[in-house]
Amino acid sequence: MAKLNRSNIGLSLLLSMFLANFITDLEASSHQDLNQPYRTGYHFQPLKNWMNDPNGPMIYKGIYHLFYQYNPYGAVWDVRIVWGHSTSVDLVNWISQPPAFNPSQPSDINGCWSGSVTILPNGKPVILYTGIDQNKGQVQNVAVPVNISDPYLREWSKPPQNPLMTTNAVNGINPDRFRDPTTAWLGRDGEWRVIVGSSTDDRRGLAILYKSRDFFNWTQSMKPLHYEDLTGMWECPDFFPVSITGSDGVETSSVGENGIKHVLKVSLIETLHDYYTIGSYDREKDVYVPDLGFVQNESAPRLDYGKYYASKTFYDDVKKRRILWGWVNESSPAKDDIEKGWSGLQSFPRKIWLDESGKELLQWPIEEIETLRGQQVNWQKKVLKAGSTLQVHGVTAAQADVEVSFKVKELEKADVIEPSWTDPQKICSQGDLSVMSGLGPFGLMVLASNDMEEYTSVYFRIFKSNDDTNKKTKYVVLMCSDQSRSSLNDENDKSTFGAFVAIDPSHQTISLRTLIDHSIVESYGGGGRTCITSRVYPKLAIGENANLFVFNKGTQSVDILTLSAWSLKSAQINGDLMSPFIEREESRSPNHQF
């Protein structure tokens, strides 16, 4: 069979997606028949079994790739984890591929754990990943594609040089705490750099730095890229540059140039949250220094203040943007996951960039979500009176995209925030919708049942504090995602999440965007300054029985400047149909030369 050119590939892929959409519709009906109300319509998930960390997202020859930690044996985590693999042309519709690789050699025989993809200067993708070796220690391995002409990269090979990075008595690295290599970056000296997460016995978190000229032979640097005491294990580190102007992304090897800051993200195993700092990378000393006010610990800002972990970014060189993925775990007991046959989602992919202040990252659903939009409802200039609730009719409330902008006029009516109120999640947990204040709670009720016995509320409260130095009133915006009434099933984790939003309501409107998808609610406050993701499992507010409301339970009225809500169509997510066959190169022997 002749190799397909780019146009033939595109035609074959369109045909495959058409057929796969038909298959997916049948599968969706089957899921409903099998009582699967919590499977999502447009969030990434395998057809079955367990999924956790996103691994090695990239774009290659016009095809987006997502690898992920996958247990092919069941709906709970298993040490024999493999690299699942799916591909897409738009980051919305996905085709399942065979696993990229499985435990198969001494350096990964007990599991192929998380890692990243690096695109070499010649365009060849290379995977660095953590393997659990025959001694159950953590080591770093490499995998390369068998056929670089295949845009779907369906076959990968493990060179005999594995493992490339190990622990020993000399380097003193704990073999149980040495994992998750990042995307590598190329220095001006021609050497590659990569960091691996670790920690010491006294809970110092580390980003261990390695260097290589050929991507095979790696040498540990004398000093880590960065460390912080009393933080515990740093999982899934991510280190990438961001532009100080505009929202365009920056290629990972763009280091030390004018107009660039760096972000170091770590996933702290002790809290199961993702924290980031913004700072400077000294390319001569190979150290990262957070900006003043940032510390790489629990005081750092989080990418998401809800159910969100092990995130990973990649640079999309086609659309000049950096895209963020994150694992969204279940909030249901394991027995429920086993019964339904699957566990774990990925957040909808987000564009991520540096705010113009240089002090925080902004996140927003990628623009491709708009291709799923259907029926639309628009409101303009409505008043939400104190204690009022308005229903939003005309959209599929269980699968929707909602944007609303609020304006508060009488800010002086805000309650005073106490100096001891420093924990936003605690404030949200103690002050549910029944606790009225001057300004708030106001926001959205999503996945609400007809009798309001079930609902998930995403809302704001505004407080004021007096600045004794300048004798000026400051306002504090609190964003909450309250799952306490989300389900009649009390076996679920129905924690309430909360965070402060860095906006000034005296000069700015208060905006909220919420993506609703059956069992996941992703919310973006203040234009993406604060993100909160939750998992919910209603018993009543399912499918057509789900409702959407806007509410104001405060004592003062709030203006809705605009509200736009869209029904979202289902995407094709990992149907059984594979990508079109492409004839392999004459030699099937992998080329291990970089």
Swiss-Prot record:
Signal sequence coordinates: 1-28
Any one Gene Ontology BP term: carbohydrate metabolic process
Swiss-Prot/TrEMBL keywords: Apoplast, Cell wall, Disulfide bond, Glycoprotein, Glycosidase, Hydrolase, Secreted, Signal
Binding-site list for substrate: 50-53, 69, 77, 113-114, 179-180, 235
Disulfide bridges in this chain: 428-480
SMART domains in the record: Glyco_32
Tissues in which the protein is found: Expressed in seedlings, leaves, flowers, and seeds.
EC code: 3.2.1.80
PANTHER family: BETA-FRUCTOFURANOSIDASE, INSOLUBLE ISOENZYME CWINV1-RELATED (PTHR31953)
Name of the protein this chain belongs to: Beta-fructofuranosidase, insoluble isoenzyme CWINV3
Origin species: Arabidopsis thaliana (Mouse-ear cress)
Lineage: Eukaryota, Viridiplantae, Streptophyta, Embryophyta, Tracheophyta
